[in-house]
Amino acid sequence: GLLYRRWVKQRAADVDRLSGGRLGYVHISSMDDPSFRSVYADILGKYNDREGIVIDTRFNGGGRLHEDIEILFSGKKYFTQVVRGREACDMPSRRWNKPSIMVTCEANYSNAHGTPWVYQHQGIGKVVGMPVPGTMTSVSWETLQDPTLYFGIPIVGYRLPDGSYLENKQLEPDVKIANSPEKIIKGEDEQLETAVKELLKEIDSKK
């Protein structure tokens, strides 16, 4: 809706302002195909020349994107395409080859627990925000005779190499920070501000 679009637009403007135009911002509203296409278009389109990307997963109710996000943001530059002495693009050109950081909150659910877990576990980047409850399972949606009543029945677990399951394993962010009500009503987003600072610090340390 309009309120959501305004919220995303404000966050993108904040990241642009706080980073001096160095970072881009994307929000993954749901772990589904339309959300992935939107993120893909933004990071390889209007943010292609940015030094890093802030990936916001807050308030995401889940779906199935953990593999797609892992592949998209784990690109490693192996060469640059040059046309008559002018750089055209880095390769791979269909993946993000530069630094990124992910923002989470307590309202993340299901695959919005699994996706940040994979992102952190694979060492793609830091996770900033609040812990995410261990809700990574896949469900079968069952509708009753009254079609307004339906339930998601957990049927798929995600087993780790040690034999345990990801479900009930709370994800702890690398940088834990809450958005206080006092700051929220002023329009300030401490989690986003922290993510920008952390990512810029990482980028500058590699120069």
Predicted regions and their residues:
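Cleft-lining beta-strand/loop regions that shape enzyme active-site pockets
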Residues: 1-146, 183-191, 197-205
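Metal-dependent DNA phosphodiester-chemistry modules and their immediately adjacent helices/loops
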Residues: 108-110, 145-177
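Short secondary-structure boundary motifs at beta->alpha junctions and helix caps
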Residues: 176-184
